[in-house]
UniProtKB/Swiss-Prot annotation:
Family of the protein in this entry: Belongs to the metallo-dependent hydrolases superfamily. DHOase family. Class II DHOase subfamily.
Sites where the protein binds substrate: 19-21, 45, 140, 223, 255, 267
Functional pathway: Pyrimidine metabolism; UMP biosynthesis via de novo pathway; (S)-dihydroorotate from bicarbonate: step 3/3
Oligomer status and interactors: Homodimer.
The protein's name in its UniProt record: Dihydroorotase
Length: 348
């Protein structure tokens, strides 16, 4: 797998951070993931959030019902941690193979996170149980105090929450999701084998200038927010190094167009249709295509203790234009890189 390959064959990838929503939105977006990825970690921030085994089983079935015939896709369900969650319910879901991991949202950090955790101490019995049974903790790593600048929230989270937590529960497996800063890249790289990270395509391809200079681009607005270019470069260097505890997590987060193009727009990039080709472009730009397959298809399963997929897909290097929009009942979705010409795409 060396540039300038015209066709890139890799083991089927997995998406270790995905939002599928529910209802008509779910039915619209599921096929864009299920046609490419073997598995995906599905976020639980519905309204109401997924906090019980029964809710997760029902949601998993709704996802499977939306998978087109011929797609071989397994949704991996997560539990939304709350201050009042029963550790026994979490353990039951994990033992029954319903919950793959549990998600920590600091209260009000992102979309539908108002039920999130108010403090680590409030959920310590749950976290201690997770450490005991080997259940991974997935973390949206931002503090949400009103007096902390939005561009500093990830770095402050590391020092005030993440490091004290990992010092207290040394055997807990933690995924630091959608990292966006040099601080986080360095922290994960310097950590032990129980700490990993996911990175989105938008945080590898863009920085805050792309979102804000020459006009506001709402379809690049996501949380954690895009940072300055020194942070983008640190993320690119981390994936290009072949570091084996960082892996693909798109954080694909669809919102209808009118909810993005608004005076108070929603955070999230719907990147499922274009993410894999976007990652390939970054790896090619960094002269690191030899590490692309591991990032997409190997590092994640290894950290989670799951087998790699036994099928393969191909990406083709030829210019294609991304659709301007995707139909959604009585609205539209605007995909990541809408209307732009991309270099790599999945071979159909």
């Amino acid at each position: 797998m060396t540039a300038p390959s015209q066709v890139l064959k890799i083991r089927r990838p997995d998406d270790w951070h995905l939002h599928l929503r529910d209802g008509d939105m779910l039915k619209t977006v599921v096929p864009y993931t299920s046609e490419i990825y073997g598995r995906a970690i599905v976020m639980p921030n519905l309204a109401p959030p997924v906090t019980t085994v029964e809710a997760a089983v029902a949601y998993r079935q709704r996802i499977l019902d939306a998978v087109p015939a011929g797609h071989d896709f397994t949704p991996l369900m997560t539990c939304y941690l709350t201050d009042s969650l029963d550790p026994n319910e979490l353990e039951r879901g994990f033992n029954e193979g319903v919950f793959t991991a549990a998600k920590l949202y600091p209260a009000n950090a992102t979309t539908n996170s108002s039920h999130g955790v108010t403090s680590i101490d409030a959920i310590m019995p749950v976290l201690e149980r997770m450490e005991k049974i080997g259940m991974p903790l997935l973390v949206h790593g931002e503090v949400t105090h009103a007096d902390i600048d939005i561009f500093d929230r990830e770095a402050r989270f590391i020092e005030s929450v993440m490091e004290p937590l990992r010092q207290r529960l040394t055997a807990l497996k933690v995924v630091f999701e959608h990292i966006t800063t040099k601080d986080a890249a360095d922290y994960v790289r310097d950590g032990n084998e129980r700490l990993a990270a996911t990175i989105t395509p938008q945080h590898l391809m863009f920085n805050r200038n792309h979102m804000l200079v020459g006009g506001v681009r709402p379809h690049l607005y996501c949380l954690p927010i895009l940072k300055r270019n020194i942070h983008q470069q640190a993320l690119r260097e981390l994936v290009a190094s072949g570091f084996n505890r960082v892996f693909l997590g798109t954080d694909s987060a669809p919102h209808a167009r009118h909810r993005k193009e608004s005076s108070c727009g929603c955070a999230g990039c719907f990147n499922a249709p274009t993410a894999l080709g976007s990652y390939a472009t970054v790896f090619e730009e960094m002269n690191a295509l030899q590490h692309f397959e591991a990032f997409c298809s190997v590092n994640g399963p290894q950290f989670y203790g799951l087998p790699v997929n036994d099928t393969f897909i191909e990406l083709v290097r030829e210019e294609q234009q991304v659709a301007e929009s995707i139909a959604l009942t009585d609205d539209t979705l605007v995909p990541f890189l809408a209307g732009e010409t991309v270099r790599w795409s999945v071979k159909q």
